[in-house]
């Protein structure tokens, strides 16, 4: 197993994200070669840049240029662009356009396996624009023979990005506003997610194309957040429930949801 891993080469998009940076270090510890693609490869640490198994490259979802994918065995596609402006008149999904270009590049370089990280929010009836974008990308990747991983909320590992901001908010506030406090979630530790994605990256003829990952039994969102606050800061959080339905109606009418 270890000898095979030493010869493996993986490309990661969205590589400077929370999952991306943790996954890079996870692969490098196993002597797996990593080509890391992100908006600003100069932001990678000096330790990463000095690692002979690591290369960083500029990348955006809107780019149509050729990607440096020579000798890559598989791709972990983490890159995602959230739309922060009004969605009224929003016609082109940059995530779907990025998926199309990535698949076209894989055909050029004869790469058979893309692992697309999606979300439990991705399903046909989802109200979330984020979930709608993920769902559209899922279909495109599956239709082209690639693999989709629907993940629950990711936690653990080195705290970066959204997870870092979440922990900071829990640390800094005794009162915590929350929408859908009782919503069922299926969290997954980042170590488990990385192990499964790495395993799937080695399958070139996998007949199953959609995997849903997370705890077997759901827990409530407010319980999950309260456990994080207690574990890291030994504190109790008082949650302030916000009216999710009213907020959805207002934001949807304004075109921001």
Where are these regions (language model features)?
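N-terminal Rossmann NAD(P)H-binding glycine-rich loop of SDR-like oxidoreductase domains
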Residues: 9-30
